Amino acid sequence: MNGYTLKTIARIRSDFPTKFGIPRQAGIVSELESLIVFETEYRNDEALRGIEDFSHLCLIWQFSENVREDWSPTVRPPRLGGNTRLGVFATRSPFRPNALGLSCVKLLGIEKREGLGTVLRVAGADLMDGTPIYDIKPYIPYADCHPEASGGFAPDSGARLTVEYAAGVQERVPEGKRDALTGVLANDPRPRYQHDSSRVYALEFAGLEVKFTVDGDVLTVISAEKEEASYVGDDKQPR
């Protein structure tokens, strides 16, 4: 058997319409909330029986914006500055022979949504809005937790930035999204090789275009404006 067709069982609804700004790993911004919405064929509550007994879930999904026909045996992890090459299987790079991702998220709730059926509300996901999910498995602590594990070139989440907002800007961010946005920015969404303090970066988040600068270890949000015809991931209502 040389191949196998994976079926999309669900898609995520998140606050990230583009790749820029998505946390580099799941769980590092616990304030981020997303919805897992099942495809019509899999909207069967029996498939979720017992899932409420687990606190965390493992998602297997596709790097849908990074699918390529070819692949390279080595990649350049941003964590190492973008110059050092490592074997693709020694990294979590999206540029893989099979563009599959694995994320552990916290299960916040199981809800009924009109027109969507039963959905899963989760925290800490590192997925772009609309990302296809191929499988969901419960996280089992006794088997999946390894306190003695070593993290190679990424032993921790890295240095965090201090986030400041220009006068009046934070109030433009919906109150329920402020902590999540601050967490995203504190983890420095910039490409690792860009350190120009005069550069203005723009991040699309929760229906807003958020512009910021970084000087040293301080990130300053200079504006947060609503985007035209944009959508917020958890309800898809125009803002």
Stretch-by-stretch model annotation:
Residues 13, 105-108:
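Conserved positions in beta-strands of structured domains
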Residues 1-100, 112-121, 125-239:
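Mixed-charge, low-complexity intrinsically disordered regions
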